[in-house]
Amino acid sequence: MRQFYQHYFTATAKLCWLRWLSVPQRLTMLEGLMQWDDRNSES
């Protein structure tokens, strides 16, 4: 899981609008995306 977070932050650091988000904001966004993905994969 740690490697996943490293890839996530490396990828998002290159996106200008995500670069300005703090680490907690990016974690919150990631959690929301993962929940959304879980809901979509169940249906």
UniProtKB/Swiss-Prot annotation:
General remark: Entirely encoded within the transcript for the small RNA sgrS.
Induction record: By (toxic) non-metabolizable glucose phosphate analogs under the control of SgrR (at protein level).
Q: What does this protein do?
A: Acts to promote recovery from glucose-phosphate stress due to intracellular accumulation of glucose-6-phosphate caused by disruption of glycolytic flux or in the presence of (toxic) non-metabolizable glucose phosphate analogs. It may do so by inhibiting the transporter activity for glucose uptake (PtsG) as cells that overexpress this protein do not seem to import glucose although they have nearly wild-type levels of PtsG.
Provide the protein name.
Putative inhibitor of glucose uptake transporter SgrT
GO molecular-function terms, A-Z = enzyme inhibitor activity
Q: Which organism is it from?
A: Escherichia coli (strain K12)
Q: Which InterPro entries match?
A: SgrT
**Lineage of the native species?**
Bacteria, Pseudomonadati, Pseudomonadota, Gammaproteobacteria, Enterobacterales
For this UniProt record, give its keywords in alphabetical order, as a comma-separated list: Phosphotransferase system, Sugar transport, Transport
Q: Name one Pfam family in it.
A: SgrT
| Top-rank taxon, per record | Bacteria
Q: Keyword Transport, does the record have it?
A: yes
Please provide the Gene Ontology terms (biological process) for this protein: negative regulation of D-glucose import; phosphoenolpyruvate-dependent sugar phosphotransferase system
